[in-house]
Amino acid sequence: HEPAEKLIRWNAVAGVVALLVGGILALLVTTTRWQAIHLLPPDWFYLVLTAHGLDMLVFWIIFFEIAVLYFAAAVLLKCRLATPRIAWVAFWLMILGAIINNVAVFRGDSSVMFTSYAPMGAHPAFYLGLILFAVGALVACFVFFGTLVVAKSEGTYNGSVPLVTFGAVTAAIIAVFTIASGAIILIPTF
């Protein structure tokens, strides 16, 4: 289970790093909204708010979800990860997408928060980062589904899957539809 354990750790750590960055940005947003301090100028406020929202509501949650999916399949069902190399490609696509997106925001031309469609267009790198992240997350979800098939075919469990794994299956199905819809909507903007 070593490839799965490494991927679980790396995805969880990436999620915690995104949470930390988003938390620091939340402090900047809070101190700006506090009239006594008013830390950031208006143009930086929306820039920081955009990065905070993406790091906290997209990157942290999805990195952590992928870690949970791999745990629920490989560890709880005691089987090997279906395609570890493809899982690593998915992870690095997600990392690359998150970095590109944050760089695009902090360059100052992508402070659109979650309204990144006309007329509030952002730099193409902003959309590229989100699309790469989404593709990586989708690939990771399919690795999870493949791992479930491996577990069933190798007979690593009897009867139905554990409740946590069932919950992970439900979360992965919702994630696939949500992430795919989001990525498809963003493709024309890129």
Region locations from a protein language model:
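Membrane-embedded and interfacial regions of multi-pass energy-transducing membrane proteins
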Residues: 1-190
